Amino acid sequence: GNADGSIPAWDGGLATNAGSVDSRGFLANPYASEQPLFTITAQNVDQYKDKLTPGQLAMFKRYPDTYKIPVYKTHRSATVPAAVQEAAKRNATTTKLVEGGNGLENFDTANPFPIPQNGLEVIWNHITRYRGGSVRRLVTQATPQVNGSYQLVYFQDAFTFRTNLKDYNPNKPSNVLFYFKQRVTAPSRLAGNVLLVHETLNQVKEPRLAWLYNAGQRRVRRAPQVSYDGPGTAADGLR
């Protein structure tokens, strides 16, 4: 936590009985009954401008009557399985930055630097953060135009970390962090297009591997443009 108590100490994260779980497996909001401690508006924004981003300040100027930021009590609700916590302990004494900070060596599972010493280590903690092992999700994307119009694009995303594969062997080094697949399901002019990515740990040794399947052409091509700040699929360059 911090000195004034506005950020509490971490006590292990959200308990398994923190709220009810519905038939689809979703946890109910355990903080649903909480009320904001205060609300930032265009009238009092100057009191908090040192804690707001330029984008937030711009929103208050553009929409002074409607844009508000309710501020709630801070909760340290994040938690990970015990095996991930143990891996982080091992990483603390074994993992090293290589290739000028562009890769990792002797890394296992997640959180290579539990006690980060510089910005690069913080970035790698974010890149390798635990995200549940494997995930399948449905995504709806809207890219608004200046006039307010938009076209919805629907995706099926799936990704899995190498450590979640059945044949994973921690004693067998691999340069792959996770595998990602994205399939467009609508609109019809884009439906069937597929993106496949092998995300690598050391991208100097082996750059990210990506392929695109174009349903209209029925061809698979390598996709080196899927890197760094390359635009997201069907986002008109806005994401």
Please annotate each region the language model reported:
Residues 194-239:
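Acidic, serine/threonine- and glycine-rich low-complexity intrinsically disordered segments
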Residues 1-207:
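Solvent-exposed N-terminal domain segments of exported/luminal and surface proteins
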